[in-house]
Amino acid sequence: MKVEKNVVVSISYQVRTQDGVLVDEAPANQPLEYLQGHNNLVIGLEKALEGKEVGDKFEVRVQPEEGYGAYSENMVQRVPKDVFQGVDELEVGMRFLADTDIGPVPVVITEIDGDEVVVDGNHMLAGQELHFTVEVVAAREATLEEIAHGHVHGAHSHDDDEEGHGCGCGGHHHEHNHEHNHGSCGCGGH
């Protein structure tokens, strides 16, 4: 079966930055399962998978424009420390969901300067070329429900990220409307 729109595809993969740093992977015994053609992966990877078949192995370089976008200085802001009410001790690297005019935006603390905190709302892989090594492990027709919802339902789907654009940031919610992540953030796990 060819990979095309409305096909549920299982892939094993590794993704590295242009510097060769491994940022995420899904081994063949725990593949990533997604619905093709519904923007559940970074655009460049989904395009590269189109037309492939089970058993195909390939490598693809995804430019920022078809990955997580360009890095934007406008996404970096200084905010008063007191906006983090309820957090006992702030540390560089902490992740939160910031309430904005456009809705919640994931941010990471990059600097603490007295009573001010610098937060960065860019995706951690923004501005980076990504190098994927991929194998198509399985493919099947999607159910009508999966097509209607735009994502896979089942045992091997990953729902770490509502947008399905690859960042398995995890985290837990605090009562003060921020999300804080103790772990790392890869670009694959949906």
Swiss-Prot record:
The record, for SUPFAM superfamilies, names: FKBP-like
Q: What does this protein do?
A: Folding helper with both chaperone and peptidyl-prolyl cis-trans isomerase (PPIase) activities. Chaperone activity prevents aggregation of unfolded or partially folded proteins and promotes their correct folding. PPIases catalyze the cis-trans isomerization of Xaa-Pro bonds of peptides, which accelerates slow steps of protein folding and thus shortens the lifetime of intermediates. Both strategies lower the concentration of intermediates and increase the productivity and yield of the folding reaction. Also involved in hydrogenase metallocenter assembly, probably by participating in the nickel insertion step. This function in hydrogenase biosynthesis requires chaperone activity and the presence of the metal-binding domain, but not PPIase activity.
Report what the protein is called: FKBP-type peptidyl-prolyl cis-trans isomerase SlyD
What positions does the entry give for Ni(2+) binding?
Answer: 167, 169, 185, 187
According to its UniProt record, this protein's enzyme class is isomerase
Q: Which residues form the PPIase FKBP-type domain?
A: 1-95
| Region annotation IF-chaperone: where it falls in the sequence | 76-120
Q: Name the source's superkingdom.
A: Bacteria
Question: Which intervals of the chain are annotated as region PPIase second part?
Answer: 129-151
Q: GO MF terms on file?
A: metal ion binding; peptidyl-prolyl cis-trans isomerase activity
Its taxonomic path starts at: Bacteria, Pseudomonadati, Pseudomonadota, Gammaproteobacteria, Pasteurellales
User: What family is this?
Assistant: Belongs to the FKBP-type PPIase family.
What does the entry's domain section say? The N-terminal region consists of two globular folded domains that contain prolyl isomerase and chaperone activities.
Q: Name one GO cellular component term.
A: cytosol
Catalysis performed (reactions): [protein]-peptidylproline (omega=180) = [protein]-peptidylproline (omega=0)
Which UniProt keywords are given for this protein, alphabetically ordered? Answer: Chaperone, Cytoplasm, Isomerase, Metal-binding, Nickel, Rotamase
Region feature (PPIase first part):
1-69
EC annotation from Swiss-Prot or TrEMBL: 5.2.1.8
Location of this chain's protein in the cell: Cytoplasm
Its BP terms in the Gene Ontology are: protein refolding
Q: In which organism is this protein found?
A: Haemophilus influenzae (strain ATCC 51907 / DSM 11121 / KW20 / Rd)
